[in-house]
Structures are given as structure tokens and as C-alpha cells.
Amino acid sequence: MITIDLAFSPASADLIDAADDEGTRSRLQEAGDWECELSAWIEALRQDHGNHCPEVVRTCDSLSLGISLLDDASIAELNLHWRQKPTPTDVLSFAALESEMPMVAGQELELGDIVVSVPTARRQALEQKHGLERELRWLVSHGLLHLLSWDHPDEDALAAMLQKQEHLLGMGSNVRS
């Protein structure tokens, strides 16, 4: 089983206070559930040789990544700086992996960072008629796939990515929909 070193930046107190249930509050302020779920997701992706999982990820023992849960203004600032889009977005991924990156035995592999807008996730959860916790998991799974070199330049690639996200979310977590 892979070891995950998660740098977790929780949501602000006002975003946590607005959460509807304890499970969602936990996801917004604690790293534990994320560490367990990311570990399971990455292990499943490493085992599935039919997907896009870089060889360096398949063979490493330990990796690190970050999750930051932000407000719309903060993610809009990042979106403007990195994508020249002056609006909030649901999730941004900042991948650290480069293709054919050499790996030293025993060295921790840095995947990158996933940044999620909690208010945007909340709006999308309402639109999709499911809970905020599920939407947060959906967005983090999407960000994780981007960190692992997945992309969606066309409809077929997007469909494959969305199907993989559904698979990851279906792996089992005690989530209220």
C-alpha cells in the first residue's frame, strides 16, 4: 500500500460553519478522510494497467500532494494568474510530475496540488441534487486524475475521465449523497 503525505489546507471557518452535516464539516477541516480515500484511489489506479497512470507513480512507495479548500475570490485569483480567466472555477490542479521523470529508490514523489472552491462546489451540488461532500469528492477525484496526467481535450477523453471519477467515488466511502 502506498504512503500518502497530504498537505491539507482546510476551508475557512465561515465555509465550515455553513456545512449541512458532520461528514461534510469533517471533509472541510480535517485531512484524515482525504488521506484514506486518496490512498485507496491511487492504489486502485496503480493496479489498473488499462488507465493513464504514470509508471513512476505505479512504482513509488510514497507520494505527496496538497489539497486546498478555498472561497471563490481566492480561486478566482489563482484562475486569473494561471489561466488568464478572471472568474472562479470549481477545481484547479497544479501537477508537479514531468513525463519520464527519474525516481530515486525510497524518495517521495511529489504529485502537485488540488485547489477546490467550496462555494462553487456547494452551488454545483445543489444543481446536481446531491450533497456537498459528494461534490467535493468528485472535484478532488477530477483534480487527482489531472495530477496523474489525465486530460480531456475532446469529448471521448472527457467521457473516459468522468467514468473513471464515477469508479473512484463508487469504491466506497461513507458518504451522504
Swiss-Prot record:
Q: What's the EC number here?
A: 3.1.-.-
The GO cellular component terms are:
cytoplasm
Gene from which the chain derives: ybeY
Q: How is the cofactor bound?
A: Binds 1 zinc ion.
User: Per its Swiss-Prot or TrEMBL entry, what cofactor is needed?
Assistant: Zn(2+)
The organism encoding this protein is Synechococcus sp. (strain CC9311)
Name of the protein this chain belongs to: Endoribonuclease YbeY
Family note: Belongs to the endoribonuclease YbeY family.
BP terms from Gene Ontology: rRNA processing
Q: Which domain of life is it from?
A: Bacteria
Q: Which UniProt keywords apply?
A: Cytoplasm, Endonuclease, Hydrolase, Metal-binding, Nuclease, Ribosome biogenesis, rRNA processing, Zinc
Give GO MF terms, alphabetically.
metalloendopeptidase activity; RNA endonuclease activity; zinc ion binding
Q: What does the function comment of this entry state?
A: Single strand-specific metallo-endoribonuclease involved in late-stage 70S ribosome quality control and in maturation of the 3' terminus of the 16S rRNA.
Cell compartment(s), UniProt: Cytoplasm
User: Where do the annotations place Zn(2+) binding?
Assistant: H142, H146, H152
HAMAP family for the chain:
Endoribonucl_YbeY (MF_00009)
